[in-house]
Amino acid sequence: MAQVEDYSSLHRLRKNSEILSNANKILVANRGEIPIRIFRSAHELSMQTVAIYSHEDRLSMHRLKADEAYVIGARGQYSPVQAYLQIDEIINIALEHNVSMIHPGYGFLSENSEFARKVEDSGMIWIGPPHNVIDAVGDKVSARNLAGKCNVPVVPGTDGPIDSVEQAQEFVDKYGYPVIIKAAFGGGGRGMRVVREGESIADAFQRATSEAKTAFGNGTCFIERFLDKPKHIEVQLLADNYGNVIHLFERDCSVQRRHQKVVEIAPAKTLPVEVRDAILTDAVKLAKAANYRNAGTAEFLVDNQNRHYFIEINPRIQVEHTITEEVTGVDIVAAQIQIAAGASLQQLGLLQDKITTRGFAIQCRITTEDPAKNFQPDTGKIEVYRSSGGNGVRLDGGNGFAGAIISPHYDSMLVKCSTSGSNYEIARRKMIRALVEFRIRGVKTNIPFLLALLTHPTFVSGDCWTTFIDDTPSLFEMVQSKNRAQKLLSYLADLCVNGSSIKGQIGLPKLTRDADIPVIHDINGWDIDIKNTPPPESFRQYLLDYGPEQFANQIRAFDGCLIMDTTWRDAHQSLLATRVRTIDLLNIAPATAHAFRYAFALECWGGATFDVAMRFLHEDPWDRLRKLRKAVPNIPFQMLLRGANGVAYSSLPDNAIDHFVKQAKDAGVDIFRVFDALNDLEQLKVGVDAVKKAGGVVEATVCYSGDMLKPGKKYNLKYYLETVDKIMEMGTHLLGIKDMAGTLKPAAAKLLISSIRKKYPSVPIHVHTHDSAGTGVITYVACALAGADVVDCAVNSMSGLTSQPSMSAFIAALDNEINTGITEQNAREIDAYWSEMRLLYSCFEADLKGPDPEVYNHEIPGGQLTNLLFQAQQVGLGEKWLETKKAYEEANMLLGDIVKVTPTSKVVGDLAQFMVSNKLSPKDVERLASELDFPDSVLDFFEGLMGTPYGGFPEPLRTNILAGKRRKLTRRPGLELEPFDLKKIKEELQSRFGNSITECDVASYNMYPKVFESFKKIQEKYGDLSVLPTRFFLAPPKLNEEISVEIEQGKTFVIKVMAIGDLSPQTGTREVYFEFNGEMRKVTVEDKLAAVETVTRPKADAHNPNEVGAPMAGVVIEVRVHPGVEVKKGDPLCVLSAMKMEMVISSPVSGRVGEVIVHENDSVDAGDLICKITK
C-alpha cells in the first residue's frame, strides 16, 4: 500500500514555501524574548529553528518556541549566565544538528568577534557583521577613531583605552568634570560610571572595569566628557554584502535609567529636520567607512544646542528594533537572515528612497523590577499573566506566562510592549491603555512607574533627556496596582486550607444565605423605596445649619426623650466581641437612615471598635466611618472618645488627640462622647478642648460606678454633682452619664437625673447603661421621667444581657406618654435584619443565658464582661470563670475601688486574670508586690499613665509594684510626653507603606502603632477584605459554590472554588483552584496544620528562682536576652502577649543567662520554662 504524504505537516508546508535554499536551519545563541522574535521571522522564511538553554532555563518559553532545543552543559557545570557564553559547545551543538546559520541576538556573545570568527570558520553563516567589522566598530575606541577619519563629531575623550586610574585622572585634569567611564565592549548600560566633581575617580574606574569584565569578559574602558542632559538618538542601519547601506531612520532612546534604555520612541519627536538629516547622513557614512554588513545601530548624543556627537556603533540587533519595524514596515530580523544568506538590499526591495516612516511608535520594557526599591529585580512565580492587545499594540514576550518562575539569574524583562499610531499622542495613549490592561501577579513589575512616566508633562511633550528619570523624583509617586483579585483569592485559599484565623471565633456562622433587607414604612404605612428615595432631613441638618450650641438647644427643646441607637457599636461590642463588619452595617444603613430618621444619633465609631476593626477584622476604621457617613447623611453620628487617651488605652501627647479628633470630625463624626475612665477632669479636658477646636458637638461625660445610694460608698450623690459642676464650668454642649456596668438602679437614676436637671435646666442630659442585671428599661423610664433628654438603646435582637436595654421595650414602657422619635414598627423592621445578624455572628456569642444581678457586686462593665470571658478561655482560665469574677472584685479593691471604664476596666480585668492564673490572694499581691511581674496595664495604671483616681493611689502597694520598674507621675501624663512630630511620622509611614498613607493613617498609628503595622501587612497580603461577605470571611465557600463579591460600584468578582490539591510534602503547601470570572486561577497556600508538630515544653520549677516560667498562656513577641548575657534582678527577659494584654517577663534574680528556651512567636502555656539564670 502506497504511503500517504501528510500535506498538512509543518515540514511539508516549509518545503513547499522554502525561500533560502542554501540556509534552512537557524540556531539562536540567546535566551528570552529575542530568540522567540527571531524564530518567528525564521518560521515565516520556512526555516527550521534550534534553541539552546541552560539547566535553569529548562522551563523557559524560548525553548518551547523552537523546533529543537538543546541544553548547554550538564547540570551544575556552568553558571546560569556562563552557559550562554560557551562558544565551542554552542558551535558543536550547531554542527551536530546540521545548523546552517547562527543568530547571536543581543547581549551574551552578540558582540564577541571570536564567536563570529569561529562560526564563519566552521562553515556556518553568521548573522551579523563579520568578525573583523565587530573588532573595528564593537570597540568603542576604534569606533571613535573611525568617526574622526570620517569627520563625524565625537564627544571629547581618550584616543584609546585607559589602563589605570592615573590615566583617568590625567583626562579629568585636562577636560574637567563631569566625565563618563565606559566599557569598550558591550552595552546595556553596564560598565558605565558618571563621575562628578568631588566623587572618587578611582572607585568609579574600579567599578566600571569590574562590571565590564563580568558582563562582557573584557574590562577594557575608555573615558570621555559627560554631556549634561543630552538626548540619545540612534539610527537603525542595514547593509548588504555588496557595499550597499541604508538607514531606517532614527529612534529617540533618551529615557534611560543608569544608561539603560527604558522607553524608546520612533521617530524622534522633537528633533529638528536639519539635525535629523545630519545624523542620518553621518550614520550611513560611518557604516560605509567601516565596510559594515547586516543590521546595526549608530548612536549619537544631541546636546541642548542641537549639536550631535557620535558615540558608538552597536554591531547587533537592538532590543528596540520593534518600533522601527512598526513605523517603516520593514522586518529587520528577516532582512538580517536574508542578507546573511546573500540577498542584496535591492533584491529585498529595501531602497533608501522607497523607505519612509508612518506615524509614531513607542516601546516599553515590562520588567519584574520594583521601582519603589530602586528598581530591585523581583523573583518568584507569576501567578496571573494577562496581556494586552488590540489595535496598534505589539507584544514581544519571553517568560511572560502564568506559572513562569522568574529567577535572579537573568534579565528581568518579561515582555516588550510596542504601540503605534498616526501621531505621537495616539501612540502614547495606546501605550497607557495597553499597560493598564496588563494583569501580572506574583511578582512586582515596573508598570506603575511606566504609567507615571508616560503621563508626565515632559514625556508628553517629547522633551526627555538621558538623566530625566534620575532628575525627576516625582516619577516615583506611583499609583500601585491594587491586585485585588489575587489578594482576595489568597485569603479564600487560606480559609479553604486552614480555616478561619479570626480570633474569638468558635464554630461557623449559622446563617448561610444573604440576610433580608426589611421594607421600611412611613408614618402613613406606605412602603419607602429606600434605593431611590433620599433620606429625610433630621437633627443632623439642623446641626450643620446652626452649629453645636443651637443643636443642643434643639435637643433640649424636644418634647420627649430621644433615643440613640447603639447597635452599630456598643451593642455588638457587648454581645458579639465587637466583631460586626462594615459590610453588614452598610447593608442595613439605607433602611436605618429612613427608619430612625428622628433618632438623636447612631453610635457607630470609636472605643473598642476602632482597634478591633484593624486588629481582628482587618478593616480600616476610617474607611468604615466614611462609607457609613455617605450611606446615612441625615442622622448624627456619635463616637466614644477616651479623653486624653483618644481611643487608645493610655495617655498620648495632646497634639495627637487634637489631630485624631480633627480627622474624625472631618470624616463624619458629629457628636463626641468624651469621658475619662477615672473621671479625672484634667484628662477629660484634653478631649473636650480637642472637640471644641475641631468644631464638633461636645458631650462631656461622668462615668457612673457602684451604687450611690448605698451608705458609705465612695461614689455618692455629692461626688457626682460636684463632678458635674466642674464639667459645666469646663463647658459642654451635652452632659453624658455613662453607666458602663449597668449598676445605676432606677431609684438612683431618678435622684441623680432630677438633681442635675434642677441645677442645670438647660443642658441636655444623655444617659447610657447596660442591661446586665435586667433592669435597664426600668432605669431608663426613671431617667425619662426625671428629665433625661436622650437614652441609649439597641434594637431588640441586639439588646439585653451585657448590651443596652431594648429599644422596643423602652418605647412600649413609655406607653406613648413620652415621644421618642422612633416608632415601634420601624424598630421591629430594623430588628428583623439584626436577628439574622445574630445568627451570622453566632460564632462570637458569649455563653450568657440571662441577666446577672451579680453585676451589682463585681461591677464588670457590659462591654468588658463578654470579652473578659473570651480572654479567660484563651489564656486557659475558662473553667475558672467564677473565680475570675470574684478576683475582679478583689482586684478592684486592691486598685482603690476605681471607676471601671476602658481602659481602667482592662487594668482590673488583667490583674484579676493574673491573680487567678498565679493563684494569688489579695494579701499575696500586697506581700509580693515588689517581686511579681505584673501585666503592663497594671504598671501603666500605677505609674499614672491613665490619670489619677479619685482619692489617690493605694499605698504602699503603688510604691512596691513600681519598685525598680517604673517612676511615679506627679502631673497629667500628657504633660510628660513630647508632642508627636506628625509630619515626620507620616513621612516614615510613607517610606514603609507607600504614598497612599493619609492623615487618618497617621492618627491610627499614633493610637496603636503595632496594630496599625500588622493591619497594613495583612492589607498588603490580602487587600481590602471588608468587601467580602461575612459568611465567606468566617467560613470557606463549598466546592463549586459560586459567590459574588462587589469590590466597588459596578465591578463584581464571580468566584468559585473548584478543587483543593493534595499536600506537597516537600513544601507543606496545597494548591487551591478557582474559577475567577470564568478563568482558571491557582493559589498556593501553606497548610499550617500539616506543619504543626506537638511540642512538649519543659516546665519551670516554681520553687527554683533561677528558672523563669511563663506566668500565663500567650505568645512570645520579643526575646530580649541570649545565653551568656549578664542580667540584674528586674531586667526584662522577654515580652509575652495574651490577646490585648502584654507582659514583660523580668529576671527574678541577678546572674548570667544560661539557656533561653523560647523564641519569638512561640506559644507557651502558664508555667512553661522561659529561660534559666545561673549565678
UniProtKB/Swiss-Prot annotation:
Q: What is its EC number?
A: 6.4.1.1
- Cystine pairs annotated here are none
Q: What is its main location?
A: cytoplasm
What residues does ATP bind to?
A: K140, E224, H259
GO annotation, cellular component aspect = cytoplasm
Provide the GO biological process annotations.
gluconeogenesis
Occurrences of domain Biotinyl-binding (ranges): 1099-1174
**InterPro entries, A to Z:** Aldolase_TIM, ATP-grasp, BC-like_N, Biotin_BS, Biotin_carboxylation_dom, Biotin_COase_C, Biotin_lipoyl, Carboxylase_cons_dom
Pathway given for this chain reads:
Carbohydrate biosynthesis; gluconeogenesis
Q: Which reaction does it catalyse?
A: hydrogencarbonate + pyruvate + ATP = oxaloacetate + ADP + phosphate + H(+)
Give the enzyme class.
ligase
Positions carrying N6-biotinyllysine are K1140
Residues annotated for substrate binding in this entry: R569, D570, A571, H572, Q573, R642, T902
Write the record's keywords in alphabetical order, separated by commas: ATP-binding, Biotin, Cytoplasm, Gluconeogenesis, Ligase, Metal-binding, Multifunctional enzyme, Nucleotide-binding, Zinc
From the record, give the transmembrane residue ranges: none
Q: Which residues carry this modification: N6-carboxylysine?
A: K738
What function is annotated for this protein? Pyruvate carboxylase catalyzes a 2-step reaction, involving the ATP-dependent carboxylation of the covalently attached biotin in the first step and the transfer of the carboxyl group to pyruvate in the second.
Q: What is this protein called?
A: Pyruvate carboxylase
The organism's taxonomy opens as:
Eukaryota, Fungi, Dikarya, Ascomycota, Saccharomycotina
